[in-house]
Amino acid sequence: MIYKACIRKRCGGVCVGEELKPEKIQEIRLGDCPICGGKGTLKAIQFIHRIPYFGEVMESTVVCERCGYRNSDVIILEEREPRLYEVKVEEEKDLFIRVVRSKSGTIELEELGIKIEPGPAAEGFVSNIEGVLERAKEVLLMARDFKEQENDREAVRRIDELLKYIEEVKEGKKPLTVRIMDPFGNSALIGEKVKSRKLTKEEIRKLSKGPYIVIEPDEVPQQ
């Protein structure tokens, strides 16, 4: 059973944003809100983290002061190539491996069969493995409520198995393979156990890119 979702809830666990003080903070007025039409109520808040052994990462959050609309993204400020990062979570300390996920990043939780893909409502975040599991858990709980209303007992049973597996991963009792892939190089896993490699052109083509558009050199119209 594969669950695909754009997850917008809080990250849960211990976030990198809570561990590291931002080096720079900037607030920009953007004008009117596209959701509620509030005049001059939309603003962007930007701050920069310097993550050890990785570099500078900017978190940008757009907020409406009137209706509460909120959307976030993460941008790595140093030029990076399209990459795949992978780590095997085997013990509790692995839960603190850092996760930088931009709107263009795809996260796979292999043993759970869960894929978090980019989409119109996707948000970027800086967190850790535990935070990603909490996000997945929240989506599964929402799906469980929906399936209960439909009286789909088999789906509820399968979701309960996934929720149990997540708790066992957090307790260090079950393994979990975590991958993050980003065609723009704006996402990463950061830790000693993490393995990474450059994405192939075929892998890049297959990835969902959300609100972003990629133009291949051979697709540019001739003048």
Curated annotation (Swiss-Prot):
Family: Belongs to the ZPR1 family.
Gene3D superfamilies on file: ZPR1, A/B domain (2.60.120.1040), ZPR1, zinc finger domain (2.20.25.420)
SMART domains, sorted: Zpr1
Keyword Signal: no
Cited Pfam families: jr-ZPR1, Zn_ribbon_ZPR1
Single GO molecular function: zinc ion binding
Domain of life according to the entry: Archaea
Alphabetical list of InterPro entries matching this protein: Znf_ZPR1, ZPR1, ZPR1-like_arc, ZPR1_A/B_dom, ZPR1_jr_dom, ZPR1_Znf1/2
Keywords of this entry: Metal-binding, Zinc, Zinc-finger
Protein name: Uncharacterized ZPR1-like protein PH1223
Zn finger spans (C4-type): 33-67
